[in-house]
């Protein structure tokens, strides 16, 4: 009883009495959320595992799909293109079905299953189709790329990059190259050797402070590649001409050359000694400027072919040659500030004599031409020029007074000079002569003008007097002649 009661107490809750009670089996209460259990017609397999699910079922599916794929590829030559498209589409659909049914299936399993039958086909095409059907992560893509690169083989005539031996400079020794490439290789090797041997010592000297900037530039240019500056090998320095430096045919002064312009125009391929070249260019430019006739002509003053009486009276001695051209004897005279005191005094006396004895009349006509004539009031022509006064001005006649021409002269001190007046021409002997009627008309004009003198010795500025003198006593024989005052 005790055992029975103990059993009952141990099996269930403690009860009173010795009756044995068995536990009842209660059915599991099903809820609407639970799906009904599908019963398969196949007999249940014992001990199912993930290997059977990953290998057996996909293998059967792959076998059926591979049979279709092989048949489509083998008989594609005899079939039309439309049939081939249908077969390929069916194969792709079959492969997609396989991937949907078995998402854990890998590419290696597919290749291992199809390996016996795919050996006769183009494996590259199969691989391409398989790759197009999949999407890869970045790591998987990098791994596939590495595998493909490892399997790359060069053209049969050229050895692969893995089998060829490389030297220290990264150049292959088994590949045959042309003469030009061999020359470039030799130059590169030579340049590297020179750079390794000589560049260290040169740069050490510059770092210590012993080298100048010019030495640094020279070492830098020497260390450059020989093919970096092709013009440096066959460079023949030539001194830049004035036309290239300044852009003009001839420089006007040697000071126009500056070091900055020379450096800018000459370029980087010129000589290193710039200062010597600047000196040479300046000396050459000065030489050319002195030798050039245009520069010499520009230094000499240009004189008018007509000499005025006022210039002659101031002391500028001028004379006429046989051709009628004026030769100035004081072209290289000192400036006005350097004239001696005695010469200045003589010039003052001559100007005073002009005020007393002669008047220079200048009139302008409506057409823009000027007429100049010399007043000779109070002065009579003499037959001998040696009897002329020392401080006066006289107009003499060397020729016959009864002739058609007269030759006027101007006497200043002991010097007698010819005067070129309006209407003057050359006589048969080559001297300057004035027609007699022109000279007489000038004398009459002087007499009328002298009667209208003012207190300061100059003619009156009334327009009526000038107009009457011009109308009455001015000759218009030479309409094209112009005299400059």
Curated annotation (Swiss-Prot):
Q: Main location per UniProt?
A: nucleus
Superkingdom is: Eukaryota
Q: Which GO terms describe its cellular component?
A: endosome; Golgi apparatus; nuclear envelope; nuclear inner membrane; plasma membrane; trans-Golgi network
Q: Does the keyword Membrane apply?
A: yes
Q: What happens when the gene is disrupted?
A: Aberrant nuclear morphology.
Disordered: region residues? 1-50, 74-116, 249-270, 364-404, 444-485
According to the UniProt entry, which residue ranges have a biased composition of type Acidic residues? 82-98
From the Swiss-Prot or TrEMBL record, state where the protein is found: Nucleus inner membrane
Tell me the residues on which N-acetylmethionine occurs: 1
Any keyword Membrane?
yes
Biased amino acid composition, Basic and acidic residues: 32-42
* Keywords attached to this entry: Acetylation, Membrane, Nucleus
For the motif Nuclear localization signal, give the residue ranges: 22-25
Biological process (GO) annotations?
Answer: nuclear membrane organization
Bias regions of kind Polar residues — which residues? 373-393, 452-469
Q: How does it assemble?
A: Core component of the LINC complex which is composed of inner nuclear membrane SUN domain-containing proteins coupled to outer nuclear membrane WIP proteins, the nucleoskeletal CRWN/LINC proteins, and, possibly, KAKU4. Interacts with CRWN1 and CRWN4.
Q: Its biological function? A: Required for nucleus structure organization (e.g. size and shape).
Protein name stated in the entry:
Protein KAKU4
């Amino acid at each position: 009883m005790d055992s029975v009661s103990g059993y009952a107490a141990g099996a269930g809750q403690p009860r009173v009495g010795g009756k044995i009670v068995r536990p009842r089996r209660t059915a599991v209460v099903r809820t609407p959320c639970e799906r009904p259990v599908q019963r398969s017609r196949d007999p249940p397999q014992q001990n199912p595992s993930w290997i059977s699910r990953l290998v057996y079922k996909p293998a059967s599916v792959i076998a059926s799909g591979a049979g279709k794929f092989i048949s489509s590829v083998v008989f594609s030559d005899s079939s039309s293109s439309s049939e081939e498209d249908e077969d390929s589409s069916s194969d792709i659909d079959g492969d997609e079905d396989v991937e949907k049914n078995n998402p854990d299936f890998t590419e290696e399993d597919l290749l291992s299953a199809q390996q016996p039958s795919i050996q006769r086909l183009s494996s590259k095409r199969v691989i391409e189709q398989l790759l197009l059907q999949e999407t890869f992560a970045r790591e998987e893509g990098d791994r596939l790329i590495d595998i493909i690169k490892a399997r790359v083989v060069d053209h049969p005539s050229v050895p692969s990059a893995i089998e060829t031996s490389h030297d220290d400079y990264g150049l292959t020794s088994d590949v045959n190259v042309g003469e030009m490439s061999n020359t470039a290789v030799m130059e590169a090797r030579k340049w590297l050797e020179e750079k390794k041997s000589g560049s260290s010592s040169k740069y050490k000297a510059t770092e210590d402070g012993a080298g100048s900037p010019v030495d640094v530039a020279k070492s830098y240019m020497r260390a450059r590649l020989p093919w970096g500056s092709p013009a440096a090998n066959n460079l023949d320095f030539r001194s830049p001409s004035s036309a290239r430096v300044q852009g003009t045919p001839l420089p006007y002064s040697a000071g126009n050359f500056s070091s900055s312009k020379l450096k800018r125009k000459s370029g980087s391929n010129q000589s290193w000694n710039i200062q010597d070249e600047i000196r040479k260019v300046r000396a050459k430019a000065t030489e050319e400027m002195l030798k050039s006739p245009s520069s010499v002509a520009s230094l000499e003053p240009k004189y008018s072919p007509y000499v005025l009486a006022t210039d002659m009276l101031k002391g500028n001695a001028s004379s006429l040659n046989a051709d009628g051209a004026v030769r100035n004897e004081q072209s290289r005279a000192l400036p006005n500030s350097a004239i001696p005191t005695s010469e200045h005094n003589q010039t003052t006396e001559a100007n005073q004599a002009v005020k007393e004895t002669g008047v220079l009349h200048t009139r302008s006509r409506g057409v823009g031409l000027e007429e100049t004539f010399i007043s000779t009031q109070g002065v009579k022509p003499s037959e001998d020029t040696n009897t002329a006064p020392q401080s006066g001005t006289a107009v003499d006649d060397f020729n016959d007074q009864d002739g058609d021409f007269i030759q006027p002269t101007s006497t200043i001190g002991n010097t007698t000079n010819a005067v070129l007046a309006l209407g003057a021409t050359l006589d048969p002997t080559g001297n300057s002569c004035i027609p007699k009627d022109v000279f007489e008309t000038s004398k009459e004009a002087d007499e009328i003008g002298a009667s209208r003198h003012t207190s300061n010795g100059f003619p009156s500025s009334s327009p009526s007097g000038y107009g009457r003198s011009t109308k009455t006593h001015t000759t218009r024989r030479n309409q094209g002649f112009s005299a400059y005052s």
